A protein has these predicted regions:
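N-terminal secretory signal peptides
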Residues: 21-68
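Residue-identity detector for glutamine
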Residues: 2, 41-42, 73, 99
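Functional cores of ribonucleases/endoribonucleases
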Residues: 51-118
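Bacterial N-terminal signal peptides
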Residues: 3-16
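General helical secondary-structure elements
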Residues: 2, 19-22, 89
């Protein structure tokens, strides 16, 4: 009986780790910096230079409520506005930063993300 229990535990752990890995890989679509819109490239440079940022909400915590990025503790991600030509408001484009120095770009207000490759 203990043998079956051990097998069950091993199988459960294997399935769980596979599911966690799949969840981590959700945002695997990549985009090169050179392929980003010019405004996104400029925002990325501002982020790396620690500002100054043009929008008051730049740098706020991004909650990842839709769980489209890898799951991390609250406060791990921060968001920055990418200017949209012709828009008076903040528009839909953002760069999300992670504490692990990863950067994600969305041009549809958090529906899809591409990880920025430098």
């Amino acid at each position: 009986m203990q043998h079956w229990l051990r097998l069950l535990i091993v199988a459960w752990l294997a399935i769980g780790s596979t599911l966690c890995t799949a969840r981590e890989d959700r945002a695997v679509n990549w985009v090169f910096v050179a392929d980003l819109p010019r405004e996104a490239q400029q925002t990325l440079e501002l982020i790396k230079d620690s500002g100054p940022f043009p929008y008051a909400r730049d740098g706020i915590v991004f909650g990842n409520y839709e769980k489209r990025l890898p799951l991390r503790q609250r406060g791990y991600y921060h968001e920055y506005t990418v200017k949209t030509p012709g828009r008076r408001d903040r528009g839909a484009r953002r760069i999300i930063t992670g504490q692990g120095y990863e950067y994600y770009y969305t041009d549809d207000h958090y529906h899809t993300f591409r990880r920025i490759r430098e």
